[in-house]
Amino acid sequence: MLGSLVSKRTAPAPRLLLQLLRSPSLRSHESATGQSVTTGGRGEPQWLRAAVGGRHGTSPALLTGGGAATGGRQRGRTETPCLAAATWGRLPSPEDTLPGQDSWNGVLSRAGLGVWALATALVVHCYSKSPSSKDAALMEAARANNVQEVSRLLSEGADVNARHRLGWTALMVAAINRNDSVVQVLLAAGADPNLGDDFSSVYKTAKDQGIHSLEVLVTREDDFNNRLNNRASFKGCTALHYAVLADDYRTVKELLDGGANPLQRNEMGHTPLDYAREGEVMKLLRTSETKYQEKQRKREAEERRRFPLEQRLKEHIIGQESAIATVGAAIRRKENGWYDEEHPLVFLFLGSSGIGKTELAKQTAKYMHKDAKKGFIRLDMSEFQERHEVAKFIGSPPGYIGHEEGGQLTKKLKQCPNAVVLFDEVDKAHPDVLTIMLQLFDEGRLTDGKGKTIDCKDAIFIMTSNVASDEIAQHALQLRQEALEMSRNRIAENLGDVQISDKITISKNFKENVIRPILKAHFRRDEFLGRINEIVYFLPFCHSELIQLVNKELNFWAKRAKQRHNITLLWDREVADVLVEGYNVHYGARSIKHEVERRVVNQLAAAYEQDLLPGGCTLRITVEDSDKQLLRSPELSSSQAERRPPKLRLEIIDKDSKTHKLDIQAPLHPEKVCHTL
């Protein structure tokens, strides 16, 4: 791997072309032709003088008298095609074949030398090493191992973590050039040793930034290092990666002592140890990795004690305390080594739609993998309802279309074998898919269509299903009603210490006599259900949780109104009580979201369209005065409340705290709209 990053250059370096510009053969050819490219009366262009050192008399005239390099004369000067291309920003690529040149690695012939040399000189001038800022000067001093200059620039306010315009930092420059003294000074000044390089490869960087690849190549070699393979990708490499590539023990030691992470991976997924040669550097890295892992385990354990998983999950999920506690306990066993390492952890989430099953899986993955996208794999099992679609799961066998692409699951598990895998709506999958999942849950490994085995015993598999959701919802509502009645009876008996609780627990009798027969009838095999570590039940929301859902949704729209329209949105407490009535137990939190959109957002959109909302105003959502009594009088019949539900209105709050109702014109009724043919 090291050989792929360190260049073994056999072809002439781009800087060698500048030496060719000074060659006697080129001068003698110029004398024979009597032609030169000049500007002004000094016989040489200013940009060419800068390219070869900035001194008069050092730049030779360019060959322009023959072949394809010859251009038209305009006002006493010769303009070659390459110069014209440079003027329009279209320099030829080094890999392109030029007149008189067989390839980039070949030797330029006399006929094409003037064209390519002119292009090179233009590039070098554009990227000449004359720092225009303290940050650029800091990187130049770091490359030159000038410790005094580095200290002076830092004292004058140079940013120690500033990036070169192509992506690297001064610490990376010092590390790759084996300047351990500069590394020590930069670390003491607060340089971050774990920053990754934004530079990928010469050609990709040139494409991304819209500049010529030769410009990037010369800049990389001049400002960074000329021993690296310019076709390899260095994106994400830290200063420690570069120090290991340079095989400099002292620099590696300085970086590790300064807090560099020996386990940090670059974009290719490689740690610094992957690039180490046999010797002292490799031994040092192995020892450091072991120590760093031990420190990391202690730090994470302390963090888990201070901020338990259940508390983190509750920040993102409303309600479902029993489900959160079940998942948190299982994850805690796994994190602390109290689990079976031969089998993966398997959950089955049961409950109605829109009740938090998928969100709990996402937050679990976020906790386990620190926001890494590869750490969460989601498969919609409704895409695997037919038998022939099983091939998409693990990959097509040899000879079939899609064999080389691999399966949706196996391909992602190869990238992250310890991922959190969500099988959404598993009840819709074909039975053959369940057979594959049975092997996956039992042995913790999977064989793809190419015959390769993926070991995923460290993964977490979560299945969601709407099977038995109606039974679970009705049972939970019944338990909640019974608990409410019991609390009211005890309050009526003057037991002042009684508190009404919304917490309920699904009984074991209900799980065994109601839920398990339904699951067995659907999945048709006890061995599949037996591989599930925990069956987690998601219950309908209680009233207090619905109020939280309403406030969360209103806060979302208040933030959107402030960001997009500079409108401050407020609401009364009674508004949440009105919107809660839109809850549907079968649709969960989505029914609250839709109710807010219908009754609040529709009015906001209509008022904005009718130009009733001035910029920077303050809006308040309130309940009509005539309907507030309806909310305060529970004795009103349900039929009366059904005929006339409470109405919400929008009010603008003036600077003097006075309010006035917005007169929003209702759109025409669909039946009154006349369509003209």
UniProtKB/Swiss-Prot annotation:
Pfam families: AAA_2, Ank_2, ClpB_D2-small. ANK repeats lie at residues 133-162, 166-195, 235-265, 268-297. Residues 1-28 form a transit peptide. Residues 477-505 are annotated as: Regulatory. ATP binds at residues 316, 318, 353-358, 425, 466, 531, 590. It catalyses: ATP + H2O = ADP + phosphate + H(+). It is found in: Mitochondrion intermembrane space. GO terms for molecular function: ATP binding; ATP hydrolysis activity. PANTHER family: ATP-DEPENDENT CLP PROTEASE (PTHR11638), MITOCHONDRIAL DISAGGREGASE (PTHR11638:SF93). Functions as a regulatory ATPase and participates in secretion/protein trafficking process. Has ATP-dependent protein disaggregase activity and is required to maintain the solubility of key mitochondrial proteins. Involved in mitochondrial-mediated antiviral innate immunity, activates RIG-I-mediated signal transduction and production of IFNB1 and pro-inflammatory cytokine IL6. Plays a role in granulocyte differentiation. The ankyrin-repeat region is necessary for ATP-dependent protein disaggregase activity. It plays an important role in stabilizing the substrate-bound homododecamer by mediating contacts between the two homohexamers. Belongs to the ClpA/ClpB family. This is Mitochondrial disaggregase.
